A protein has these predicted regions:
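Nucleic-acid endonuclease domains
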Residues: 1-171
Length: 171
């Protein structure tokens, strides 16, 4: 029997994802939000013209989870149609953006697919959550830095004040 995701975990995941999308929209106000179908089937959250980007929240520099298979056992987001993956990374002051194709190739070359391991041992090895058909691996920020496309897009440092709409600056 498959277990569902707890309400608390789903809520935390939604909040962190929602925060990442809010930050992304502030960095790229011209980006067009994808449709629900594009998000689910193409793994694209935003469009910049004909270039798709998949935004990932809830990451740490020493814990970046890459989905090889989703919870249904289907190809994960690293095999999606987005051109870029944007990892929300507050420790870097913005989004770490890499080519999805480069990340996929990095995983092909460096991730050991031969056996499943426990979560604590999942660095460049495969892990599957209990009662799920997913396959994920853990990378770290230094791994992403080796990709030629690696770039950090700083967070937007301004916002509109709710009283009057004056432009305010964070720093």
């Amino acid at each position: 029997m498959k277990r569902g995701v707890s309400v608390a975990r789903r809520s935390k995941s939604w909040r962190s994802g929602n925060l990442a999308t809010t930050r992304y929209e502030r960095c790229y106000p011209e980006a067009r939000k994808s449709s629900r179908a594009e998000d689910i089937f193409m793994h694209i959250d935003y469009w910049h013209g004909d270039i798709g980007v998949d935004v990932k929240g809830n990451n740490l520099p020493d814990e970046i989870w890459v989905e090889l298979k989703n919870v249904r056992g289907e190809p994960g987001w690293v095999f999606g149609e987005a051109r870029y993956i944007a990892f929300d990374m507050p420790e870097c002051g913005g989004f770490v953006i890499v080519s999805r194709e480069e990340l996929k190739e990095y995983c092909r070359l460096h991730v050991d697919l031969s056996e499943l391991v426990q979560k604590k041992d999942a660095y460049k090895r495969c892990y599957s959550r209990k009662d799920r058909d997913d396959l994920i691996t853990k990378l770290v920020l230094e791994d992403l830095r080796t990709l030629p496309s690696y770039v950090v897009k700083p967070y937007c440092n301004s916002y509109s004040h709710p009283d009057g709409g004056d432009k305010m600056y964070v720093s």
